[in-house]
């Protein structure tokens, strides 16, 4: 009811369904042009084609128990997420965001958080818009133009924007 009452556009919204299982943190992922790895997370990597940043450590939850394993080999400031992690290797004009990006199990344990998913969603939306405007496939757009658009819309496309 909060959304209906306070957020314009939600007046007629309704809950259609909920997940069959709570706490699912990982699902299928694409094989992308680039793959986010635990080394990239741990080493706070920077990428020329970054479209989002994440500053969450690697937290791996036990799928059957309650144990939590934090991987903190050194203090993680934040790391860039490259555009190529959203671009499938073998499909054109498709962008994938959230926990389905091209990432290793360990890297996804950091990147799957909501704030990062929202940043990647914004990047994908602007990339799709740029793709239509430039009459190019999503994988062929200028990532530099995308980064400029993200910055114009108040996003932080990478560490160098901090």
Region spans (language model):
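Flavin (FAD/FMN)-binding glycine-rich loop and adjacent Rossmann-like elements that form
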Residues: 1-162
């Amino acid at each position: 009811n909060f959304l209906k009452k306070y957020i314009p556009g939600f007046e007629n919204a309704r809950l259609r369904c909920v997940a069959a299982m709570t706490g699912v943190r990982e699902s299928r992922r694409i094989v992308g042009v680039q793959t986010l790895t635990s080394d990239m997370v741990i080493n706070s990597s920077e990428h020329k084609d970054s479209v989002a940043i994440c500053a969450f450590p690697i937290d791996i939850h036990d799928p059957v128990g309650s144990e939590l394993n934090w991987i903190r080999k050194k203090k993680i400031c934040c790391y860039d997420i490259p555009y190529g992690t959203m671009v499938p290797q073998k499909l054109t004009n498709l962008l994938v965001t959230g926990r389905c990006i091209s990432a290793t199990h360990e890297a996804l344990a950091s990147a799957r958080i909501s704030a990062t998913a929202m940043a990647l969603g914004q990047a994908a939306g602007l990339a799709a818009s740029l793709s239509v405007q430039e009459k190019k496939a999503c994988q062929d757009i200028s990532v530099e133009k995308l980064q400029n658009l993200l910055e114009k819309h108040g996003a932080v496309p990478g560490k160098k924007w901090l």
